[in-house]
């Protein structure tokens, strides 16, 4: 059984292009792309416009330029996971934290060729794009314990082993020694 992980970051400008495979990538096997699945509620641009409108209506001012109302989670999955698994996970994350999944993608076509064996080494993962705001367009403020709980929920919903909790000051050397 694989270990679970989800890494959350502000969404990037090229997120939809990457997730929807609108650009050719050298680490993607096009012959496996038919195994990818997607779930799209709306475009990132439309959701941002809606958030900005709600924020302006509730606060009487524009949203700060540095605000990150849309965030993306990249999570490890196994070959058998489907978009329905991600929808179920998204529903649970919304119940627990109020974050709403606006897009989800399974990527089963990425990986690399082993230099030693010539064998394809897949990198099964998923991208989930979240509206990280409340009904007034204000960013949700999830703390470290919330993010730790999110890791546990990912493991539970996907039937994976919960990854080890790491401290803020974990170093790559520590990880390398554990191998």
Where do the language-model regions lie?
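N-terminal nicking endonuclease/strand-transfer module with a His-rich metal-binding environment
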Residues: 1-179
């Amino acid at each position: 059984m694989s270990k679970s992980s989800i890494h959350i970051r502000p969404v990037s400008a090229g997120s939809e292009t990457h997730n929807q495979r609108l650009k050719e990538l050298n680490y993607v096997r096009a012959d496996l792309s038919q195994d990818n699945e997607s779930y799209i509620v709306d475009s990132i641009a439309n959701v941002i416009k809606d958030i900005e409108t709600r924020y302006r209506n509730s606060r009487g001012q524009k949203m700060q330029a540095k605000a990150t109302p849309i965030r993306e989670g990249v999570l490890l999955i196994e070959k058998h996971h489907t978009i329905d698994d991600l929808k179920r996970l998204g529903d649970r994350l919304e119940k627990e934290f109020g974050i709403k999944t606006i897009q989800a993608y399974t990527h089963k076509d990425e990986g690399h060729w082993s230099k030693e064996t010539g064998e394809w080494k897949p990198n099964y993962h998923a991208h989930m794009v979240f509206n990280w705001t409340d009904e007034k367009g204000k960013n949700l403020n999830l703390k470290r314990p919330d993010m730790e709980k999110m890791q546990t929920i990912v493991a539970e919903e996907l039937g994976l082993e919960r990854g080890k909790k790491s401290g803020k000051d974990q170093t790559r050397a520590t990880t390398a020694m554990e191998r």
